[in-house]
Amino acid sequence: DVPPAAVTLLVVPGRDWSGDDLDWLRDLSARGHPLAGHGWRHRCDPPRTLHHRLHSLFISRDVAEHLSLDGAGIAALIQDCHRWFVEHGLTPSPLYVPPAWALGRIEPEALAALPFRYFETLGGVYDARERRFIRLPLVGFEADTAWRAWSLNLFNRANLAMALMAGRSLRVSIHPQDLYYKLGGQVEAWVRRLDRTLDYPALA
């Protein structure tokens, strides 16, 4: 069995959380699941830059909300995210995961001043306190179209090969609807391939 500490649950504060929902989150936290901040709305404003347009087209659709913001806006969003946990009696993980792993343009000095220590991207995890990037391969299953299924299969195989060759840990990303998408039948098999698990602070 995978220990709760190895399964980090991502929380989007700006959603419509009821009192029962918050009690459920507190119960999950009490059972040992880390709760990580995950943006604010999980929705972005219309793309204004070519980079954001291409990112939306090929990767993130309308969820990469950091890419709509400048550095100050990104920092404010992350601060608000952390504050929401505290105000609702929840213990935030030291990890922050931007929607679609798209952190946006923000300076290392600004990240170091924020209450989260670790920031996850497609390529790995950035430790803002130590100012170092920990490269970690990633596999995912959010494939609701044939194109996404094909490209994610290639992505997953390449990242598994990278993990094996470099002797690195492999991150496994599972979204709530992934089991019902085109790669849903692969999720359990990938999880079974894991011979041990780590929590994020253990990577530092």
Regions found by a protein language model. Give the residues of each.
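Hydrophobic faces of well-ordered beta-strands that scaffold small-molecule active sites
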Residues: V7-L9, L35-H38, P94-Y96, Y118-T121, ...
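A conserved mid-domain beta-alpha-beta active-site/ligand-binding segment of alpha/beta enzyme cores
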Residues: R132-K182
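C-terminal domain-boundary segment and adjacent tail
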Residues: V2, V7-T8, Y118-F119, S169, ...
